[in-house]
Swiss-Prot record:
EC number in record: 6.3.2.4
Matching NCBIfam families: D_ala_D_alaTIGR, PRK01966.1-2, PRK01966.1-4
GO molecular function: ATP binding; D-alanine-D-alanine ligase activity; metal ion binding
Name of this chain's protein: D-alanine--D-alanine ligase
Subcellular location: Cytoplasm
Annotated binding of Mg(2+) 1, by residue: D293, E306
Amino acid sequence: MTKENICIVFGGKSAEHEVSILTAQNVLNAIDKDKYHVDIIYITNDGDWRKQNNITAEIKSTDELHLENGEALEISQLLKESSSGQPYDAVFPLLHGPNGEDGTIQGLFEVLDVPYVGNGVLSAASSMDKLVMKQLFEHRGLPQLPYISFLRSEYEKYEHNILKLVNDKLNYPVFVKPANLGSSVGISKCNNEAELKEGIKEAFQFDRKLVIEQGVNAREIEVAVLGNDYPEATWPGEVVKDVAFYDYKSKYKDGKVQLQIPADLDEDVQLTLRNMALEAFKATDCSGLVRADFFVTEDNQIYINETNAMPGFTAFSMYPKLWENMGLSYPELITKLIELAKERHQDKQKNKYKID
């Protein structure tokens, strides 16, 4: 059987660089190497692109994926053809955060006309920007917690007014978030104005735009969505924490998080969550995959928190585990995502690019 040529891209110029490497390690070890000829491209923290061809062995440590000493090549050379001498059947970007899941690299793949896994330019960008995402959810009628947003330049000029707005509109605790970052990087839970000021200072180190959200005493529920024009959603799972706040450290380092799949919820609540996840997928015109995150209160009030256009595939990750619960194994999920990428690219070829 002739193998298909796949290129996995990971790393990236982002605060989520190490998360991307963890994800790449998991996917490389799970992908069907009898079906796929796999090359990898590592993007350093400085933005250099380095390639390694024909990965066949198990990746036992993330250290093996830091290709710092590899030859830096032009991007067009890296993606022109695989190490087998044939064009790539699909590129699989496993990049998290800015320059990876925000539409930028997706735009590159579009210009190069390369099939790629995951969301397109618009859906990736709108899912990355928490303010734009919330505005799209609002337009779709999806329930959300109160929030405000502002720019670094606005805060520097109107700090007093913005702090007053937060205190007038929201109740503590609140969560301060960089608008364009994931994996809980730069996020703070603030219980008073002093902590709020520190949280704002911390978040502005990562982005020029912040979102401050009302906190709520609720369970954190997640639903995985898979597909293109006709997506499917899993039964919900729950993030069960041994910590007060599900931050970067608890997500990826401490292991103080357990996943309960499926979540212990009434069936009607589970069905509502599945339907809302599909609505969120459509609201941001997604394709391939999305993880939709929700809050569910004790009286079963549901609020959508966000969608993640490139959810992680690490050992702690909810997305692949939700699909395993639906009967789709990890290797089968990877294969399905590649097939969806090819399907979307084939559909794009139906478009006309000149007027007769």
